[in-house]
């Protein structure tokens, strides 16, 4: 079935990874996840080319599927039996949209976690919930030397520049942006207002010098060790994240080997 287009996904975490790539494999190598995307040396004409540093890690990651096994509710089953052909399609489409929203929200949650270099997500097994973990990189953390409440405009600019320089030290330059928790974003807005910085507060971000700072708009649910539901975000409280926009970040959709659809697709549904 062809379901109407979903509303735009406004997740900042998901936006960072751009359009998803389809990879017709059930595995993805760790080396591919860790591949470096920096500059390479030029060579003398006629010499051998540069061998990309894909890494020697031969281990692989097996992505786990987002699988929803739903049954029509009794009240909808009654409506389904009395509905016309078009009415039946609308009931089915409502279910499919709900499932598509669940998949989107789960993808957004994984994108949030990927910003920190680790996936640590709840996974359903026959014995209950366990953790699905993937580590593919270390993220440098810096501590702001002053309290947020006393920070000046100059203090903040100095720290943002320091954060960006951590990327350039690793050979990743070019454009970048910041995502800040609500507390940090609110304080930045207060600072630029008090400093009378003209035209610094935009519709969806704040300009701190030449840096764009966005307010974290992502949240997702997880469960703690006791099984209690907790809410998480891309940024922790009083945290700001810098992300280089040309760091080679990608989102890949892999195929599953236990469903009728044998090709990699972002979403597959059947009734």
Protein language model annotation of sequence segments:
Residues 35, 125, 222-224:
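Acidic surface patches and DE-rich sequence motifs
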Residues 45, 189-191, 255:
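Short conserved micro-motifs at the rims of enzyme active sites and ligand-binding pockets
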Residues 10-79:
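Assembly/oligomerization interface modules of large self-assembling protein complexes
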Residues 4-39, 132-135, 231-235, 242, ...:
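Basic/polar low-complexity intrinsically disordered segments
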Residues 60-138, 155, 165-179:
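Long, contiguous amphipathic alpha-helices that act as assembly "spine/axial" helices in icosahedral shell
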Residues 129-202:
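Extended, solvent-exposed, turn-rich assembly/linker loops in the middle of proteins
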């Amino acid at each position: 079935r062809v379901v109407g287009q979903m509303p735009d996904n406004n997740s900042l975490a998901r936006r960072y990874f751009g359009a998803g790539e389809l990879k017709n494999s059930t595995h993805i190598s760790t080396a591919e996840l860790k591949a470096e995307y920096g500059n390479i040396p030029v060579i003398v004409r006629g010499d051998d080319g540069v061998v990309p540093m894909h890494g020697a890690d031969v281990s692989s990651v097996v992505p786990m599927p987002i699988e929803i096994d739903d049954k029509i509710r009794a009240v909808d089953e009654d409506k389904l039996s009395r509905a016309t052909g078009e009415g039946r399609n609308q009931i089915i489409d409502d279910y499919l949209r709900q499932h598509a929203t669940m998949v989107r929200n789960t993808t957004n949650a994984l994108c949030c976690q990927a910003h920190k270099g680790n996936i640590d997500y709840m996974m359903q097994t026959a014995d209950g919930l366990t953790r699905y973990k993937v580590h593919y990189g270390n993220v440098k953390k810096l501590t702001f030397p002053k309290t947020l409440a006393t920070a000046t405009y100059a203090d903040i600019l100095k720290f943002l520049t320091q954060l960006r320089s951590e990327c350039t030290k690793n050979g990743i330059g070019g454009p970048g942006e910041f995502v800040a928790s609500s507390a940090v974003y609110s304080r930045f807005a207060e600072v630029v207002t008090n400093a009378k910085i003209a035209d610094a507060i935009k519709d969806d971000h704040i300009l701190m010098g030449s840096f764009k700072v966005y307010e974290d708009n992502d949240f997702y649910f997880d469960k703690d060790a006791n099984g209690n539901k907790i809410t998480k975000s891309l940024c922790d409280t009083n945290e700001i994240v810098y992300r280089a926009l040309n760091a080679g970040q990608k989102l890949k959709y892999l195929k599953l080997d236990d469903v009728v659809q044998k090709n990699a697709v972002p979403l597959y549904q059947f009734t």
